[in-house]
Amino acid sequence: MWPLALVIASLTLALSGGVSQESSKVLNTNGTSGFLPGGYTCFPHSQPWQAALLVQGRLLCGGVLVHPKWVLTAAHCLKEGLKVYLGKHALGRVEAGEQVREVVHSIPHPEYRRSPTHLNHDHDIMLLELQSPVQLTGYIQTLPLSHNNRLTPGTTCRVSGWGTTTSPQVNYPKTLQCANIQLRSDEECRQVYPGKITDNMLCAGTKEGGKDSCEGDSGGPLVCNRTLYGIVSWGDFPCGQPDRPGVYTRVSRYVLWIRETIRKYETQQQKWLKGPQ
């Protein structure tokens, strides 16, 4: 897995005929048109929980609204100056129904950096507290968390984002892209990425390749049965290779942490608003 600073280096290697590399799916640029590798343009506002995380007007990552004041994303998307855009379909222009919030707290999972497996993006999950709650509308909705730790391999799920639609060459779409991909078994996932997969991860993709999340999609949702089953984390570069599925953070492993973290911060704010007792 390459950190952001080395994404360009791995891109250069791939263009010159080098072997595939593992890469986090984070990007700091935005561009023209296309679709998620092997995917299609989402029907506008059909993914109302989808968030876009921008820094100085440039796409960094995706995210997912899990509470009117909280967005879930990948821990490796941590960066100063994040702004969260919700109710978006097309980036680069103001749209009716969109809402924008600054981030007041970024809370990566406490084991993300401390864990011996952190170099493999173990515990790659982060909560973002928004400056104020968003208003839920037809364009903006929360997505329920999955409590199911093991869905059947082969289950079709949907991943979405504004990441590059081609790989290794890059092409960033103006509109939100979707791809329907299948869950892979834990055994297959560990065979593909020996020594790198933990119980906190899952794999999804297609045998034939061509459908995948890619750079710029990090932190976005993998939706299975209308619940948040995974968070885009990392995978091989170039994206969409046959038998090289993308790797996602397994959300069901973190439901308790998500709920306790939100409850903790909400309680602290209530105490502050009440003042000294």
Swiss-Prot record:
Q: Which Gene3D superfamilies match?
A: Trypsin-like serine proteases
PROSITE patterns attached to this UniProt entry = TRYPSIN_DOM, TRYPSIN_HIS, TRYPSIN_SER
Q: Which residues form the Peptidase S1 domain?
A: 36-263
Q: Out of the domains of life, which is the source?
A: Eukaryota
- An annotated Gene Ontology molecular function: serine-type endopeptidase activity
What do the Gene Ontology cellular component annotations say? cytoplasm; extracellular region; extracellular space; secretory granule
Compartments, as annotated in UniProt = Secreted
Pfam families on file:
Trypsin
| Tissue-by-tissue expression | Expressed in prostate, breast, testis and salivary gland.
| CDD domains to which the protein is assigned, alphabetical | Tryp_SPc (cd00190)
Matching InterPro entries: Peptidase_S1_PA, Peptidase_S1_PA_chymotrypsin, Peptidase_S1A, Trypsin_dom, TRYPSIN_HIS, TRYPSIN_SER
**Which keywords annotate this record?**
Disulfide bond, Glycoprotein, Hydrolase, Protease, Secreted, Serine protease, Signal
Q: Where is the active site?
A: 76 (charge relay system), 124 (charge relay system), 218 (charge relay system)
Q: What is its EC number?
A: 3.4.21.-
Carbohydrate attachment sites? 30, 225
Q: Which biological process annotations from GO are given for this protein? A: protein maturation; protein processing; proteolysis
Is Secreted there in the keyword field? Answer: yes
Q: Where is the signal peptide?
A: 1-16
Q: List the disulfide bonds.
A: 42-178, 61-77, 157-224, 189-203, 214-239
* UniProt keyword Hydrolase, yes or no: yes
Q: Which family does it belong to?
A: Belongs to the peptidase S1 family. Kallikrein subfamily.
- Name this polypeptide is given: Kallikrein-13
The organism encoding this protein is Homo sapiens
- Lineage, broadest ranks: Eukaryota, Metazoa, Chordata, Craniata, Vertebrata
